[in-house]
From Swiss-Prot:
It comes from the Bacteria. Belongs to the GTP cyclohydrolase I family. QueF type 1 subfamily. It is an enzyme of class 1 (oxidoreductase). This is NADPH-dependent 7-cyano-7-deazaguanine reductase. It catalyses: 7-aminomethyl-7-carbaguanine + 2 NADP(+) = 7-cyano-7-deazaguanine + 2 NADPH + 3 H(+).
């Protein structure tokens, strides 16, 4: 395999990488989209996302679903995983975590379209669902429903 590929600039993939201590320290990496010009949707699901309540320091848990229609760039999945892991010791409200993730990806990728659904498990008896998207979904791409059921508890 040639040394000069679309992957040659990646620093984290294929090597030991420590989990960043904060989302600000986390490095998201991107690769050229080998299917640029072909409309398609990419989905990442993080069913065990964790952050901390900024007031109590107690853990908060969410099921995240990230969908995007790429343009020139794809997010490198290991860097995304490490970025998401960096929230484990980060104190922020659910809304801030969800929207921050979406905006960081938009800044990095400049996608045709992106949405993130943050389905947060209850704290204080109330589940919070947070949704962010960059605009109307493209009509020429199949974008499935996120498929996360409303929280029902034991019900």
């Amino acid at each position: 395999m040639s040394e000069n590929t679309i992957y040659s600039g990646l620093k984290q993939l294929g090597s030991h990488t420590d989990i960043p201590l904060t989302p600000e320290e986390a490095v998201l990496e991107r690769v050229a989209n080998p299917q640029e010009g072909t409309p398609y949707c990419v989905r990442f699901t993080a069913p065990e996302f964790t952050s901390l309540c900024p007031m109590t320091g107690q853990p908060d848990f969410a099921h995240l679903v990230i969908d995007y229609v790429p343009g020139k760039w794809l997010v490198e999945s290991k860097s995304l995983k490490l970025f998401l892991f960096s929230f484990r010791n980060h104190g922020a409200f659910h809304e801030d975590c969800t929207v921050t993730i979406g905006k960081r990806l938009v800044d990095l990728l400049e996608p045709e379209w992106l949405r993130i659904g943050g389905y947060w498990y209850p704290r204080g008896g109330i589940p919070i669902d947070v949704f962010y998207q960059t605009g109307a979904a493209p009509l020429n791409v199949w974008i499935p429903e996120q498929g996360v059921a409303n929280y029902r508890g034991r019900g």
